[in-house]
Amino acid sequence: DLPYGCGKTKHKWDREIELTELWKEYKRLLKPDGIVCLFGNEPFTSKLIQSNTYMFRYKMVWEKESPTGFLNSNYKPLSLFEDIVVFSKGTVGSKSKLPIRYYPQGLIQKEQVKRNRPNSTWRSGKGYGGNNKLNSDTEYVTHYANYPTDILKFSRDRNAVHPTQKPVALLEYLIKTYTKEGEVVMDNCMGSGSAGIACKNTGRQFIGIEADDYYFQTAKERIEKA
């Protein structure tokens, strides 16, 4: 959870990190199929995406249970969401040589497998480019229902100890979506350590980095007590 650095707070830690240098370190540490998940709000979200369009894959939205921004409610709509930007060297698609890591949560296995064929629009390629490879002989099998969407609804944790603290349940969801038990998760701006608690709860190893001494000690204590 990087500092957004949008000049909207007076916290000394809320200064935008130099993204070019950050990506050098991420690329050095990241495994070939590793995932980078970063939270953001505009205009910071756009800066994140533009900082590495080669590895940008998609964006999700964290929808909160209640809005924020009441102090400026006379001037703009209340805010109900934050962005989650996903980067990877892996790519999306069944024919990818390096498929992106993705372990969708909450799937329900179907008792009866559903088999589909592309409709006439897909078969003709109209509107999808002339090189569309789908054809009438291709069959697509659906084994599961309840596939996740890009809208993630999670309530904020009560008694938060950091101004931008993310819900442990949301972080657990992301960790389980992109990693397996025993693997390593790093949070280089860990704040109060919620990602560390989420890793402990889900059986992952954790590396946490925090520049602020107070929050580092707070995170250490929270993780040890979890």
PLM feature spans:
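Conserved Class I SAM-dependent methyltransferase catalytic core
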Residues: 5, 12-69, 82, 86-87
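Class I S-adenosyl-L-methionine
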Residues: 8-9, 50-226
